[in-house]
Amino acid sequence: MAKHIVAALQIGSCPGSTKDTLKKILSYEKEIKESGAKLVVIPEATLGGYPKGSNFGVYLGYRLQEGREEYAKYLAEAIEIGNGEKYPEISQLCALSKATDASLCVGCIERDGTTLYCTMVYIDPKDGYVGKHRKLMPTAGERLIWGQGDGSTLPVVDTAAGKIGGAICWENMMPLLRYAMYKKGVEIWCAPTVDARPI
């Protein structure tokens, strides 16, 4: 197997602004190009934001109005995922991938109707958006705001760096998920996570 450079773009979200966060990601174009990276992994929930410490106005037995307002803002910052002009954030990530000749694995908050998912998207320099993985089991309080993935989004993607796939945060501790990916031939494991503990 040939050697390739794989990079982690260790950045955080711009609170409350997916637009500003996307600009921040795109601002690394020159550095990604100069690094020669063939794969760049961007942390869990970077686009859309990880609402660490928020409770969205929920206390056992209570739902407060200010929490509903906070959730509505969070929902508005989430992105829709797919190919084409209808998906401007994905289109801009595809342009970055093409310009840098690097595949991207990007953590984002996906909006599908009124359900949010913690998702990682795979972008290829030649083919653009090639797949996504929705977090199967949001951890603890995350279940208040994110839906569960159904297992249909466990791709292993062929890239110039090798076959990539992975899991988000605590999913990396799920042996059957890992086994499923190994059976699909994953060579490079992507683990975008907000969690600072070892995986």
UniProtKB/Swiss-Prot annotation:
Occurrences of domain CN hydrolase (ranges): 2-199
Domain of life: Eukaryota
Transmembrane segments annotated in the record for this chain: none
Active site, UniProt feature: 44, 135, 169
Cross-referenced Gene3D superfamilies: Carbon-nitrogen hydrolase (3.60.110.10)
Example GO molecular function: nitrilase activity
Family stated for the protein in its record: Belongs to the carbon-nitrogen hydrolase superfamily. Nitrilase family.
Name of this chain's protein: Putative nitrilase-like protein NIT1
Organism: Saccharomyces cerevisiae (strain ATCC 204508 / S288c)
Gene name for this UniProt entry: NIT1
